[in-house]
A protein has these predicted regions:
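A short glycine-rich, His/Asp/Glu-containing loop-to-beta-strand
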Residues: 1-29, 35, 86
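Well-ordered beta-strand scaffold positions
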Residues: 14, 45, 53-55
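Histidine-centered metal-chelating micro-motifs
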Residues: 26-28, 47, 63, 67-73
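Short glycine/proline-enriched turns and hinge-like loops at secondary-structure junctions
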Residues: 32-33, 77
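Glycine- and acidic-residue-biased ligand/ion/polar-headgroup-sensing regions
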Residues: 34-36, 41-46
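Cofactor-binding loop segments of dinucleotide-utilizing enzymes, especially the Rossmann-like FAD-
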Residues: 43, 51, 86-88
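Short acidic-glycine-tyrosine-enriched beta hairpin
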Residues: 53-67
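Ligand-binding loop in jelly-roll beta-barrel domains
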Residues: 67-91
Length: 92
């Protein structure tokens, strides 16, 4: 089962989603050629990878994935992970 994306807001310049990951769910590593992405953890803990760096982040912590850099998220815990995500510019 895939993690769930809930759109909060979008404009022609950026969008904001909340990603919800249950235990074991992940967003596999991928690259956005022209978009920067910011992850901010709202609830739970997750393993975030950006480029060659991996970090476990919890509530109130975040990371930045610049355009062209591989990034992904794994919920490696037994609790739900909720993440606020900003992407700019909006590819839509």
């Amino acid at each position: 089962e895939k993690m769930k994306k809930n759109n909060i807001f979008q404009s022609s310049r950026f969008f904001c989603d909340v990603y919800c990951f249950e235990t074991g769910q992940e967003q596999k590593g991928h690259v956005h050629g022209d978009q920067d992405k910011i992850y901010l953890v709202l609830e739970g803990q997750g393993r975030f990878s950006v480029g060659n760096e991996q970090r476990v982040l919890g509530p109130g912590e975040g990371t930045f994935a610049p355009a062209g850099e591989a990034h992904g998220v794994v919920n490696h815990t037994n609790a739900r992970l909720r993440v606020l995500v900003f992407v700019a510019p909006n590819p839509a």
